[in-house]
Amino acid sequence: MFSINARTKVPIWVPFIARKGFSMSTRQLAEPKLNQVSSLNTRNIGIIAHIDAGKTTTTERMLFYSGKTTTMGDVDQGDTVTDYLPSERSRGITIQSAAITIPWNNNKINIIDTPGHADFTFEVIRSLRVLDGCVTILDAVAGVEAQTEKVWKQAQALKIPRIAFVNKMDRPGAGFSRTVKEVVQKLQTKVVLCNIPYFEMSKDDAVFVGVIDILHNKILKWNIDEDPNGRDITVIDLQEAKESHQEAYMEALKCRESMVETLGGIEETVVDAFLECDEDYMKIPSSILKSAIRKACISNQVTPVFCGSAFRKIAVQPLLDGVVDYLPSPLQTPVPEITASTSKVSKKQKQKKNSKVSSVPIEMNPKKGLIVNKNPQLTVALAFKVMTHATRGVMTFFRVYSGSLTSNTTVVNTRTGKKLHLNKVLLMHGDTPEPVSQISSGNIGVITGTENDVITGDTLVSHGPVKRNFTDLETSIKLLPIEIPPPLFNSSIEPLTAGDARYMNECINTLIREDPSLNVNVDEELGQTILSGMGELHLEIVRDRLINDMKAKIRLRNVAVSFKETVSKPSLEVVKASKNDGLVKVEVSLEAIDGPAEESTHADENGSVLLETDNNVVKLPPEAAASHINESLSERRWKSEHSLEELNDIILQGITTGLQLGGPILGLPLHSVVVRVIHWDFPVEGKEVSASMLLDASRQVVREALSKLPESSFCILEPIMSTRVYVDSGSMGEVVHDLSHRCSAHITSIEDESENMDSNAWANEEAENLYLPQDYTMKSGKNAVNFTNKKVVVAETPLRDMVGYLSKLRSITQGRGVFDMTYLGMRRAIRPVLLDS
C-alpha cells in the first residue's frame, strides 16, 4: 500500500502510482515491440454482453487509454474502430467480431469485440473458441439480460474465466448492487467487488463521479468537467481521509470484509494473512488479496466485479488493470482438446463424433507454452474467422496454440491435407492489418492469400522456418471444431438483370466464406437462389451489404422461416442412374432419421458421412465402389487424374445438391434423410471420363429416388424453439393467452423467478449474505427495471409464429417484457398452416 496526500490531483495515469498498485501510465509499448511481449504477459479476451450494454463503447475507451488511438470513436457518430462495416456504423450495432491488439502497463491485450444480437450468435461462438478470458459488460439499468445469460453459459461451458463490468452507472435507475445480486443468482457465480461506485450529491441527486477501490482503500474521482477525455483523476486515500469521507470508508471496510470472507473460503493464504494481521481486514496486504482473486478467477471459482461508465469515460482504466491482474495468460489456460484423425473432411461435411481418432501427446511448458507431439518446433493454429479486406483480399484470423507462425513459411491444412505457402502474417487493428515477422504461441493474427483453401474451424500446422517433412500424425491433427448452428430463415435473391447474375454470385460466395452460418441453395431448374440465415436481422444485414457495400444489383424477397421436407417412410427400392453409356453408375436407397444425425445409429456405420447442413447422412462404404476400382488402387493400375478420395467427395457433392433441390411437396430442401450408396462405378484405368459425369449421376440418382416415392411418403418440417418469456405477474395472463392462441405455443411451465433462484439455493444464499452498497441512483430512477414478482413463461413455439414477436410482447407489457429463444429442432408442420404462411 502506498501513501499519498489525502487528496492528490492526478492529471493522467501517472507512472508513480502505477508502481504502487495502479496502472495510470499512458506510456505504452511501441508498436514494433508489442509483438515481442511474452506469452506470460499476454491476454486474449473477448467483450461479451447483451445488445446495447456498451461493449463497443467500452472497447473504444480501452483503445484510447492504451494509446492505441488518439481519439475516441463514438457508436452514435459511426466512427468506431471495431465497428468498421458501413452496416455497423449506420445501425450502431456490432455485426462482426473485430480483433485488435493494445498495450497496457507492459502487457499485451488481444481484444475481440463481439456482437450482442442473437442473430449473430455464431460470431460469438467462434470467438469464444480462441479466448482465454472474457469481460462481461452489464447494463446497470437493465441488469442481467437474456443474451448476457446465454453468452455467459457458453463461456462457462468452455471454462473461460470472466470478469464483470457494471456499465452505465451514470444513468438514472442504475442499480449496481441489484445487478451484482443478479449476477450471483442468475449466472451462478461467487463475486468479489474490486471497486464500487462513488457518488457526490448535486442538489437532490446522487451523481456518479468515480469508484472506491476496495483493494487499495482509495477513492478515484474522475474530473470530467476539467478533462472530458477522462484522464484527470483525483485520488483520495481513505485511510487518511476517513474522518472527512466516513461513509465511503465504512463502505470500503464492509466490502473488504466481504471480499476476505469470500476469498478465505477458497484460498488458505487469505486466512493465514488475516490471522497474521490480528484479524484486521484493512491490514491484509493488497498483494495477497490480488493473488487470491487471480487464482480464484482463473479456476472459475470467483468473478471479479468492476463498475463505471464507458460513455462518460469513468473507470475504464481500472477495468484494464483487472484484465491484466485477474484474467489468465495463454500459459495458464486449460490444454485444448487435440485429436488426430486420418479422414479428410470437405467443407460440406461434419466430422463424426465417433470417427477413429488417436490422442496426440501435449504438454504445457511454463515458458514456451503448449508443446504438441513432443515437438517444440511444431506450430498448431486454429482458423476461427474469414473476412474480405478492401485491398488485401481474403484474410483468415487464427489463434496460435503452439509454436510460432512465421512469414514466408509453409503450412498444412489438416482438414484437406493441402500445403499452403504464407508470405506474410499480420496483426489487426480494427480493419487495418499490420505486418509482423511472426505470431507466437497464445496470440491472434491474420494470414492472406488463402481464398478457397481455409475455412472457419480448420487446423493449420507448420514447422516454421525449419525444413522438414510432416509426419502422418502431424498432418492429421485437429483442434476441437467450431459448431455452426442451423439457419432458421430464408429469403430468395435474384439479380435485377441476367447480366448481374455473375457478380451477384461472386458477392454471395464472399459473404458465405466470411459467415458459415449463412447458407445458399440454388435451384437450377427454377433459376432460383435461396439465402438462409440465423434471423430476420441477419438476412437484412446481408441485403444491405450486397446492395450498399458491394454494389450488387439484386432483389431480396421477404424473409421467411426456413421450412424443410423429409422422407417419412423409407424407400427400400434401389434406384440407379448412369452416364456415358453405363461407364459411370450410382445406385442409392433412401431412409429417414429421427433426431440428430450424430446421435443416430446411422452415424456409427462404416462410411457414414454427416453432411454439414440439414441433418442429412450419406452412407458411402468402401465396398460400394466397383471391385475394379479398389483393385486398380491396390495393384497400382490407377490412371485417373482423380484420387479415390476425390471421387468420393464428388459423389457427396452430387448427393448434397440433389437433396438441396427439394422434395415434391413445395420443393423445399430435404432434411433428416439418409442416402445409402449401394454401388458406384467410374473408369479409373482406361478411357478418360469427366468427373462431372459422376457429379451429374450422383445428383440425378437422388432426384429419381425422390420422384419414385409417392407424395404421401413426405412431410414438411418446421423449426421449433424453446422460448422463455420474462414478464411481470400483472402481464403474465395476457402473455400466456397470446402465446397459446396467436403463437401456437405449448406452454411447458410458468416459473416464479425467485423460485427459480431458490432451486440453486447456494447462489441465493450467497447473494443474500454478500455485502452490497446502497443503490443511490435507483431512488430517482424512473427507468429502472422492476425485478420483483417476475415470472418466466417457458414454452415450445413454432418459429413461424414468433416472427416479429418482440413488438407484440412490448405492447402487452408496456415495454418491460423480454424473451429469448433457443433452437430445439425440426418437427412436423401442419400443411394448411404452412400454405397460409
Swiss-Prot record:
Question: Can you name one GO molecular function term for this protein?
Answer: GTP binding
Q: Sum up the protein's function in the record's words.
A: Mitochondrial GTPase that mediates the disassembly of ribosomes from messenger RNA at the termination of mitochondrial protein biosynthesis. Not involved in the GTP-dependent ribosomal translocation step during translation elongation.
Q: Where in or outside the cell?
A: Mitochondrion
Kindly list the positions annotated as binding GTP: 49-56, 113-117, 167-170
The protein's name is: Ribosome-releasing factor 2, mitochondrial
Q: Give the matching PROSITE patterns.
A: G_TR_1 (PS00301), G_TR_2 (PS51722)
What keywords were assigned to this record? GTP-binding, Mitochondrion, Nucleotide-binding, Protein biosynthesis, Transit peptide
- Output compositional bias ranges, type Basic residues: 345-355
Listed GO CC annotations: mitochondrion
State any GO BP term from the record: mitochondrial translation
Transit peptide located at which residues?
A: 1-29
Q: Which family does it belong to?
A: Belongs to the TRAFAC class translation factor GTPase superfamily. Classic translation factor GTPase family. EF-G/EF-2 subfamily.
Ranges where the tr-type G domain occurs: 40-331
**SMART domains according to UniProt:** EFG_C
InterPro entries from the xrefs?
A: EF-G-like_DII (IPR053905), EFG2 (IPR030851), EFG_II (IPR041095), EFG_III (IPR009022), EFG_III/V (IPR035647), EFG_V (IPR035649), EFG_V-like (IPR000640), G_TR_CS (IPR031157)
Q: Which Pfam families match?
A: EF-G_D2 (PF22042), EFG_C (PF00679), EFG_III (PF14492), GTP_EFTU (PF00009)
Q: Does the keyword rRNA processing apply?
A: no
Taxonomic path: Eukaryota, Fungi, Dikarya, Ascomycota, Saccharomycotina
Give the source species: Meyerozyma guilliermondii (strain ATCC 6260 / CBS 566 / DSM 6381 / JCM 1539 / NBRC 10279 / NRRL Y-324)
Q: Tell me if Ribosomal protein is a UniProt keyword of this record.
A: no
Q: Where is this region: Disordered?
A: 338-359
